[in-house]
Amino acid sequence: MAIILGIDPGSRITGYGVIRQVGRQLTYLGSGCIRTKVDDLPSRLKLIYAGVTEIITQFQPDYFAIEQVFMAKNADSALKLGQARGVAIVAAVNRELPVFEYAARQVKQTVVGIGSAEKSQVQHMVRTLLKLPANPQADAADALAIAITHCHVSQNAMQMSESRLNLARGRLR
């Protein structure tokens, strides 16, 4: 069993999603958004750090998964996004959580089956995969999709390791 916290970083809205994985079964534990309504960036970063720290304290995750930085339309946006990611990662590292990063395209490919999927498609598949009564908010859905991606990637890696070990022992041909 593992609890995974997924984070969709943003300097104004940071989405989070928490799921439990038992074997191949995924269970929804919680999701939402950290909204920073102040104007100055240092205060927003402080709120993101405090919010992520509070979520970690509440859910006690085993793994922390976050979206990688993509090339934003302007440099200022990319820098702010990078700083928001940074404080979220620091919150995880301060709690000694292993941090995993996934590209947005990989997340969409894993959850929807198309790397260029629309937000509405991600929301629908997250709802379906986690058996939710309604589509989660867009940023929370992205965070849940990041957590789901971590489950799939780590499960595939574990299966590959077991196969290699069995091959080395002469059990597979």
UniProtKB/Swiss-Prot annotation:
EC main group: hydrolase
Molecular function, one GO term: crossover junction DNA endonuclease activity
Gene Ontology, cellular component aspect: cytoplasm; Holliday junction resolvase complex
Residues reported in the UniProt entry to bind Mg(2+) 2: 67
Major subcellular location class: cytoplasm
EC number(s) stated in the UniProt entry for this protein: 3.1.21.10
Domain of life: Bacteria
Cofactor section: Mg(2+)
Record carries keyword RNA-binding: no
Gene Ontology biological process terms from the UniProt entry: DNA recombination; DNA repair
Pfam family for this entry, one: RuvC
Reactions catalysed according to its record: Endonucleolytic cleavage at a junction such as a reciprocal single-stranded crossover between two homologous DNA duplexes (Holliday junction)
UniProt keyword terms in alphabetical order: Cytoplasm, DNA damage, DNA recombination, DNA repair, DNA-binding, Endonuclease, Hydrolase, Magnesium, Metal-binding, Nuclease
Active site residues of this protein: 8, 67, 139
Binding residues for Mg(2+) 1: 8, 139
Free-text remark on how the cofactor is bound: Binds 2 Mg(2+) ion per subunit.
Subcellular location: Cytoplasm
Function: The RuvA-RuvB-RuvC complex processes Holliday junction (HJ) DNA during genetic recombination and DNA repair. Endonuclease that resolves HJ intermediates. Cleaves cruciform DNA by making single-stranded nicks across the HJ at symmetrical positions within the homologous arms, yielding a 5'-phosphate and a 3'-hydroxyl group; requires a central core of homology in the junction. The consensus cleavage sequence is 5'-(A/T)TT(C/G)-3'. Cleavage occurs on the 3'-side of the TT dinucleotide at the point of strand exchange.
Similarity comment: family membership: Belongs to the RuvC family.
HAMAP family cross-referenced by the UniProt entry: RuvC (MF_00034)
Subunit note: Homodimer which binds Holliday junction (HJ) DNA. The HJ becomes 2-fold symmetrical on binding to RuvC with unstacked arms; it has a different conformation from HJ DNA in complex with RuvA. In the full resolvosome a probable DNA-RuvA(4)-RuvB(12)-RuvC(2) complex forms which resolves the HJ.
Descriptive protein name: Crossover junction endodeoxyribonuclease RuvC
Phylogenetic lineage: Bacteria, Pseudomonadati, Pseudomonadota, Gammaproteobacteria, Enterobacterales
Name of the gene this protein is made from: ruvC
